[in-house]
């Protein structure tokens, strides 16, 4: 069985990353794609489910996992809560041939590249800053001050786009989704992947 591929997905808030991932997963037919579920020390919010949105653990349990080097990446964010990506869980799913998506920012991406040099990374850009702001306002979730802060952070995040293997401009959603699917398809057709996926066939074709 061929190993699954590990993907980093990054984008400024409002670029449509979550919508693209959701649409991709809803269209899959072989259950060979999934989004990694992170560990966190924050309290669950209404509607969040253990193992679906996050794995909710204590600070002591999280720091024990850090000491055992069981996180692919982790960070302590504003407010003092930890967030991290479990290395054993990632390895288990990749071994099953499942493509795993890591929804993280550029800083987490840098950590992961140090541990997994062959990870593939995708950055999603908005068609313009004006459109990005329009989308954030259209959500109706944030105050004017929060939107301004998100826009300021977005410019910093976008400045790291050139650290990624692939870039998708999410202007027309259907085209962006098709571009996303094309990347995943191409990665499954690489020599390394096909040698493992079709090992028996290749051996048969080369048999004398």
From Swiss-Prot:
Residues the entry annotates as binding ATP: 11-18
Residue ranges of domain Guanylate kinase-like in the record: 4-185
InterPro entries: GK/Ca_channel_bsu, Guanylate_kin-like_dom, Guanylate_kinase, Guanylate_kinase_CS, P-loop_NTPase
Pfam families in the cross-refs: Guanylate_kin
Entry keyword set: ATP-binding, Cytoplasm, Kinase, Nucleotide-binding, Transferase
Its job: Essential for recycling GMP and indirectly, cGMP.
HAMAP family on file: Guanylate_kinase
Protein name, as recorded: Guanylate kinase
Source organism of the structure: Pasteurella multocida (strain Pm70)
Gene transcribed to yield this protein: gmk
